[in-house]
Amino acid sequence: MKWKVLVIAAVLKAHFPVTEAHIFGLLDPKLCYLLDGILFLYGVIVTALYLRAKFSRGEDVPVSPQGHTQLYNELNIGRREEYDVLDKRRGRDPEMGGKQRRKNPQEGLYNALQKDKMAEAYSEIGMKGENQRRRGKGHDGLYQGLSAATKDTYDALHMQTLPPR
């Protein structure tokens, strides 16, 4: 049986010469010319739209005396806050139910450097309020860098120590 298949394959190979099929795929010159034409048309259309938008005299936006539109004048109020509220009712904290929030004058973002802690190689500057005494189990060393809400969550969980291996 194997000899039959082998003989038939040899006869077919002798009568029909082996030629490679020329399949260009994406390297076919006709396809490249077609894609170049599409890319050229796309470039012309985008350039025309850009020039039309740049040089057209459409409706002018009303300009205030300061030279900016009214939308931007509301934002340029002369003072700079980290997170400025766009709401007209400034100072109301949505997390407190819209109640007025009072700022402490000494409420800053960071504590000052302390000379005695600078002796440690890996000391860090803590946030104000971190050194306050908290209610809990007294594991403040475990909870460094966590917010008060996260610390309370960890205090509420009963953490068991793992047995030694």
From Swiss-Prot:
Residues annotated as signal peptide: 1-21
Transmembrane segments: 31-51
Molecular function GO terms recorded: protein homodimerization activity; transmembrane signaling receptor activity
The ITAM domain, residue ranges: 61-89, 99-127, 132-160
Bilayer disposition of the protein: Single-pass type I membrane protein
Cytoplasmic side, ranges: 52-165
Location (main, coarse): membrane
Stretches of the chain found on the membrane's Extracellular side: 22-30
Record's compositionally biased regions (Basic and acidic residues): 86-98
Compartment annotation: Cell membrane
GO biological processes: adaptive immune response; T cell receptor signaling pathway
Segments of this protein annotated with the region Disordered: 86-108, 125-144
Modified residues (Phosphotyrosine): 72, 83, 110, 122, 143, 154
PROSITE patterns: ITAM_1 (PS51055)
Keywords attached to this entry: Adaptive immunity, Cell membrane, Disulfide bond, Immunity, Membrane, Phosphoprotein, Receptor, Repeat, Signal, Transmembrane, Transmembrane helix
Assembly and oligomerization: The TCR-CD3 complex is composed of a CD3D/CD3E and a CD3G/CD3E heterodimers that preferentially associate with TCRalpha and TCRbeta, respectively, to form TCRalpha/CD3E/CD3G and TCRbeta/CD3G/CD3E trimers. In turn, the hexamer interacts with CD3Z homodimer to form the TCR-CD3 complex. Alternatively, TCRalpha and TCRbeta can be replaced by TCRgamma and TCRdelta. Interacts with SLA. Interacts with TRAT1. Interacts with DOCK2. Interacts with SLA2. Interacts with SHB. Interacts with ZAP70. Interacts (tyrosine phosphorylated) with SHC1 (via SH2 domain). Interacts with PTPRC.
Function field: Part of the TCR-CD3 complex present on T-lymphocyte cell surface that plays an essential role in adaptive immune response. When antigen presenting cells (APCs) activate T-cell receptor (TCR), TCR-mediated signals are transmitted across the cell membrane by the CD3 chains CD3D, CD3E, CD3G and CD3Z. All CD3 chains contain immunoreceptor tyrosine-based activation motifs (ITAMs) in their cytoplasmic domain. Upon TCR engagement, these motifs become phosphorylated by Src family protein tyrosine kinases LCK and FYN, resulting in the activation of downstream signaling pathways.
Domain notes: The ITAM domains mediate interaction with SHB.
The protein's name: T-cell surface glycoprotein CD3 zeta chain
Organism ancestry: Eukaryota, Metazoa, Chordata, Craniata, Vertebrata
Protein encoded by which gene: CD247
